[in-house]
Curated annotation (Swiss-Prot):
Source organism per UniProt: Listeria monocytogenes serotype 4b (strain F2365)
Assigned GO CC terms: cytosol
Pathway where it operates: Amino-acid biosynthesis; L-histidine biosynthesis; L-histidine from 5-phospho-alpha-D-ribose 1-diphosphate: step 9/9
Biological classification of the source: Bacteria, Bacillati, Bacillota, Bacilli, Bacillales
Role, per record: Catalyzes the sequential NAD-dependent oxidations of L-histidinol to L-histidinaldehyde and then to L-histidine.
Binding residues annotated for Zn(2+), in chain numbering: Q254, H257, D356, H415
Annotated gene: hisD
UniProt protein name: Histidinol dehydrogenase
Protein's GO biological process: L-histidine biosynthetic process
Entry keyword set: Amino-acid biosynthesis, Histidine biosynthesis, Metal-binding, NAD, Oxidoreductase, Zinc
Keyword Transit peptide: no
Binding site for substrate: S232, Q254, H257, H323, D356, E410, H415
Range of residues in the leader sequence: none
Length: 427
């Protein structure tokens, strides 16, 4: 890892904060073609693309309930118990996020209020590839269930032996209503437009590769999406009292995701910087995903030595990381200095994987600096708000002149007339 020193501005310039757009012109062109084919050919396009991209010849898209039950029966009880414990924690945290309707009748003859309604149908994308992510199923599905979404449709690409049984078991535990064995940009297109087998949804959530991310960007507006996620990120803030072995392990926990993952340590201690570097080298040797983690650390990893604790927070807030660990003495004292971070881990024993799997807060987080204006996935992402008003004639009479004046100043005479006509019989 490269060690950086200097002023805040020099460090930020050296860091050259990358905003990963997770797309390219070539990919965008390919994705548009895929979406159009799914839009016109429906299920047949999904069969063709699954054969082409996944090397799997399908005869049906929906995973039968019997297959889901059989997959769950194969899973070791200890894993199912761990999954159940995680589910309880995720549900207990997200249940506190529920928004509430309100009714305001403070003014005579006036009723105003807000309704909160769940989305009808949500599509959840679960990646395939070299790793299975049952935790991603829980994190995307459970907030939707708590919000009251009636129909949750999951898609995931099949492998040679079908869908990973741990993913299926997680989907059953979370309460997914339908599962389809299709992935990629063609799967996103199916959720956005609907096919003979797959329903059109109101919103698509879940992570994926560059094709999935680009497809989500393309269909946004036809349906809602959660966010466009880039490679995983972690920033660790550490003082001289931090444990270098803990820091190194947490940095590597993100580096093993992807060669484009970003792992950054910001510290006021040169000793901690050097010892963490040594720990990373040592721990890398025993990692099964060493090649990925090492490439990430070498090309995207950074150690920044700041002059003061305040500088540490200034740099971190500009980075706006997906994951932030505060390994400082009395970490709670610094909570309100954090302006921009997706998920925050306070203290040496609040390790980032605790949030990935178990503690309860969501692990679907803004990346690439977007924590400056985006939030983690939550219950509110699966609801919508509607306002309502009711006025008596007497209440409207008190306010009609002001309304007419505003409408006429905007040149919208029909708006003004709509108010005036209700009182014309009195003149």
């Amino acid at each position: 890892m490269k060690i950086l020193t200097g002023t805040v501005n020099e460090l930020l310039n050296e860091l050259k904060i990358e905003t990963d757009t997770n797309t390219s012109i070539q990919v965008e062109t390919e994705v548009k073609t895929i979406i159009e084919k799914v839009k016109t050919a429906g299920d047949q396009a999904l069969f063709d693309f699954t054969s082409k991209f996944d090397g799997v010849g399908l005869t049906e898209l929906r995973v039968p309930a019997a297959d889901i039950q059989a997959a769950s029966a194969k899973i070791e009880p200890a894993f199912l118990d761990a999954l159940q414990q995680a589910k309880v924690n995720i549900e207990s945290f997200h249940s506190k996020q529920k928004q509430h309707a309100f009714l305001d009748s403070e003014k005579d003859g006036v009723i105003r209020g807000q309704l909160i309604r769940p989305l009808e149908t949500v599509g959840v994308y679960v990646p395939g590839g070299t790793a299975a992510y049952p935790s991603s199923v829980l994190m995307n599905v459970l907030p939707a269930k708590i919000a009251g979404v009636k129909r949750i449709v999951m898609i995931t690409p099949p492998g040679e032996n079908g869908i990973n049984p741990y993913v299926l078991a997680s989907a059953q535990l979370a309460g997914v209503d339908e599962i389809y064995q299709v992935g990629g940009a063609h799967g996103i297109a199916a959720l956005a437009h609907g096919t003979e087998s797959i329903p059109k949804v109101d919103k698509i959530v879940g992570p994926g590769n560059i094709y999935v991310a680009t497809a989500k960007r393309e269909v946004f507006g036809l349906v809602d999406i959660d966010m466009i996620a880039g490679p995983s990120e972690i920033v660790v803030l550490a003082d001289e009292n931090a444990n270098p072995a803990f820091i190194a392990a947490d940095l590597l926990s993100q580096a093993e995701h992807d060669i484009l993952a970003r792992a950054i340590l910001i510290t006021t201690s040169k000793k901690i910087a050097e010892e963490t570097q040594n720990e990373i080298d040592k721990q890398l040797e025993n990692l099964p995903r060493k090649a990925i983690a090492q490439k990430s650390i070498e090309t995207r990893g950074k150690i920044i030595i700041a002059a003061t604790t305040q500088e540490m927070f200034d740099i971190m807030n500009e980075i706006a990381p997906e994951h932030l660990e505060v390994q400082l003495e009395n970490p709670m004292n610094y909570l309100y200095q954090i302006k921009n971070a997706g998920s925050i881990f306070l203290g040496s024993y609040a390790s980032e994987p605790l949030g990935d799997y178990f503690a309860g807060p969501n692990h679907v987080l803004p990346t690439s600096g977007t924590a400056k204006f985006f939030s983690p996935l939550g219950v509110e992402d699966f609801t919508k708000r509607s306002a309502f008003i009711s006025y008596t004639k007497e209440a409207l009479a008190k306010e009609k002149d002001a309304i007419v004046l505003l409408a006429k100043k905007e040149g919208l005479d029909a708006h003004a007339k709509a108010i005036q006509i209700r009182f014309e019989e009195e003149n």
